[in-house]
């Protein structure tokens, strides 16, 4: 049996009772934290909560050695843990599919993810369009996909959730400041008047924690603001309902 369980967003207290129950029964627990990470806790605290040791896999081992993980689940009960929800990342979906192809029982335990946590903004979830990811610019790699996604969503009046790059192995987490700067750099190159310093944006910091940071304002005012420790994400709002306007006014710190 393969149990795929999410750990939630922030700390070990996000672990569900269902995950705790299965953790007691399984033979071995694996985890990966390259797609997301719980910044409010430590591996030691998670292991203490589950009362079992955890083998952490890096990106390469998850993506290229999943066969070993799946083969173990043929005659053993294996748990695979991820931050957030276990079925958000494509890699995790692939693991579940390959396990089922081999006739392995797959149990999926859902958990809070950024897709549910953005409800804290008061923005209506059905008005979010396609999600995009903003990555750290590299000398030969600076994708403009986020710009195109925002452009297409704005045409339809939709909000855009921008996930920010995570390089957990380097302990490097893109800040909202860096994400906004990257978007402005793409605008500077494309010059299609999609984003500017006058564009309003929302920043969510430490989603899932007891005291998340919610900030709203023009990009020119947000870009140098200190949003505190990661993880951050950015939302470019589309057409706002009056209730959403109230949410941005009263639930957020307006910069």
Swiss-Prot record:
Classification via Gene3D superfamilies: Cobalt-precorrin-4 Transmethylase, Domain 1 (3.40.1010.10), Methyltransferase, Cobalt-precorrin-4 Transmethylase, Domain 2 (3.30.950.10)
User: Which InterPro entries does the protein's record reference?
Assistant: 4pyrrol_Mease, 4pyrrol_Methylase_sf, 4pyrrole_Mease_sub1, 4pyrrole_Mease_sub2, Dphthn_synthase
Q: Which key words tag this protein in UniProt?
A: Methyltransferase, S-adenosyl-L-methionine, Transferase
One Pfam family assigned to this protein is TP_methylase
**The organism sits in which domain of life?**
Archaea
Tell me its EC number(s), please.
2.1.1.98
- GO MF annotation terms: diphthine synthase activity
Reaction catalysis annotation: 2-[(3S)-amino-3-carboxypropyl]-L-histidyl-[translation elongation factor 2] + 3 S-adenosyl-L-methionine = diphthine-[translation elongation factor 2] + 3 S-adenosyl-L-homocysteine + 3 H(+)
Indicate whether S-adenosyl-L-methionine appears among the record's keywords.
Answer: yes
Q: Which family does it belong to?
A: Belongs to the diphthine synthase family.
Q: How does it assemble?
A: Homodimer.
- Protein name, UniProt field: Diphthine synthase
The uppermost taxa in this organism's lineage are: Archaea, Methanobacteriati, Methanobacteriota, Methanomada group, Methanococci
């Amino acid at each position: 049996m393969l149990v795929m369980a999410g750990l939630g967003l922030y700390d070990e207290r996000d672990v569900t009772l269902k995950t705790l129950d299965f953790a007691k029964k399984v033979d071995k627990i694996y985890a990966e934290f390259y797609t997301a990470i719980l910044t409010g806790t430590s591996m030691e605290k998670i292991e203490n909560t589950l009362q079992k040791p955890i083998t952490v896999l890096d990106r390469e081992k998850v993506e290229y050695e999943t066969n070993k993980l799946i083969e173990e689940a043929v005659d053993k009960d294996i748990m695979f843990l991820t931050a957030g929800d276990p079925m958000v990342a494509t890699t995790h979906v692939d693991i579940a599919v390959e396990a089922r192809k081999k006739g392995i029982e797959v149990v999926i335990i859902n958990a809070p993810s950024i897709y549910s946590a953005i409800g804290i903004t008061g923005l209506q979830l059905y008005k979010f369009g396609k999600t995009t990811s903003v990555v750290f610019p590299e000398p030969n790699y600076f994708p403009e996909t986020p710009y195109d996604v925002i452009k297409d969503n704005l045409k339809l009046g939709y909000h855009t959730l921008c996930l920010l790059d995570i390089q957990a192995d380097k302990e490097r987490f893109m800040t909202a400041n860096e994400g906004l700067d990257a978007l402005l750099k793409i605008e500077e190159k494309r010059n299609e008047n999609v984003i500017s310093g006058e564009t309003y944006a929302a920043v969510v910091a430490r989603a899932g924690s007891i005291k998340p940071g919610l900030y709203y304002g023009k990009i020119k005012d947000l870009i140098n603001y200190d949003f505190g420790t990661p993880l951050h994400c950015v939302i470019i709002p589309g057409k706002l309902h009056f209730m959403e306007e109230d949410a941005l006014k009263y639930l957020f710190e307006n910069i």
